[in-house]
């Protein structure tokens, strides 16, 4: 046991030595020593120290009693930021390695420099810059310097205890750099502030003005000012202010007022502000057009033009142009001009004012029309008994012509812009005094024109009655107020013209054809002329009878009656009548259908032709026998192995019949002997559908096909006929 304990002791000692060596290898790095701590910026302190072996980084700590700010840096020197300006800080440093961090170094006191002043700069004039700032904590003075931003020229530096400073004698429109910092009581400078400021430009020089009198606008130009970005031209008058702005050295102001004096000034501006106004110059525009223009013709043939005086006007020019293109004018410094004028002309008058700026704008153009002259070579032409057409040569200056016809008691008038007029609603067989007056809106009518006289044609007769007699003679009666007149009556139609004449109040016409329509008029004639025809009276002779009457049976109870329409007939009435009753139709066509016809009896056919006025002609009579009646109970029966029997019941009356079977494999027809009501088809294919029709046969041999059809199917039983099956009736197509 004792021997074992001696063996363990050396081993334990060896382990302790190893642990001590390991602990020694992982101990913290050395404590660094601060060489110096100083501040160049108001928010930071820079620290310098000797490098510690094995340290990978360093922890800088700044304390002001209220706050602690730490910063890790890689090596010396290092800077702690985020500090307060003009404040004492206790600075310590720790070295950091993989084994940990050292203890804090002995502290070092350092104070941050003063804060930079916050600058506000402006350019109150083109040669000065004003620098302003707020007071800086712990500052007792400030240094401010200025130089051109492009680096050319000298640097001006000023020290002051104030919070503002003005630099003068600078160049206009030039960009400067301003730098400022504060001092503390130890004359240690603080942070600096730097900013740029441009001086405002000088006012533009060499201003030139060009005035456009026609457009009432002015163009301005000037020499460019150093450092100017924009230019503004101002035109001031008593009633308005107009401006234009540009980046160039010219500008135009439009919408100037006539008769106005403007003060013109030009400003240059940049980001620093505007220059002083240039020396104001005066611009006088053209005078305004004269107002209150009056035109008078007194005496006739002399025009006097007058107007009111206008501002800024030196003299006046009046232009007078007639509508034939001739123009005259007068110049005067007064407010009136006189001109010669002629009748029948329209004059266009304008007044302008002139001054050194030019001609005034165009004012109102005035029209003045002198009285028109009388129309000449008037030619009245008789048109009818109640209408006269007047024509004449156009006259100068007339806008309208008034034509008046007077018979002593009544007056008829027409107005027109053309040299022609038709007087209507005149009294027939009357003497009129007809005068044409020229007229325009300004001067009215010329009442000195010479009248013309004319007598109208006789009055038109009035047809009172047109009658017919049994011998197709036409008697016409009329009434008229004319004296010593001869009357002619005319019947005009497609068949020709028929006339009769008389000096009395009636006449007779003979030989008018039937089926014709005539227009009957009467005309009176005297030495003054021929009257207008009377109002026409229609005359219609009885219509001619239709031809080609045809009766066709459509179905068992319906027939169609057709014919060729005779002259004048507009409608027809067809009547079928028998002992069983009557069937009638009234139509405007050349055919009609008559229903409810009884089969197998004799009818009397009557046709009437009726004109548009109701004249009727009984034109045609004919006997017609209606077709035989359709059989009843048509059926199909199997007849032996290959045959079919068609059976029916004969209806009223005796008739012959014909049977037809229509199938896809053929048509099969048979005709029974007289008096029989069945018929056999001995050979017919099975396996088909058949349409069966039994038709009466007229005495003429015509088969009537309007009877109903039935459908049967015939089946096969082996090679022979099978069942005969009824499928229904077939609709007519």
Swiss-Prot record:
InterPro entries in alphabetical order: FN3_dom, FN3_sf, Ig-like_fold
Domain Fibronectin type-III: 28-115, 116-202, 203-288, 289-373, 374-459, 460-544, 545-632, 631-715
Residues of the signal peptide: 1-25
Glycosylated residue positions: 230, 433
Domain of life: Eukaryota
Coiled coil feature spans: none
CDD domains with a match to the protein in the record: FN3 (cd00063)
Cellular location(s): Secreted
GO CC field: extracellular region
Transcription regulation listed as a keyword: no
Entry keyword annotation includes Secreted: yes
Key words, A-Z: Glycoprotein, Repeat, Secreted, Signal
Protein name from the UniProt record: Fibronectin type III domain-containing protein 7
Organism: Homo sapiens (Human)
Gene: FNDC7
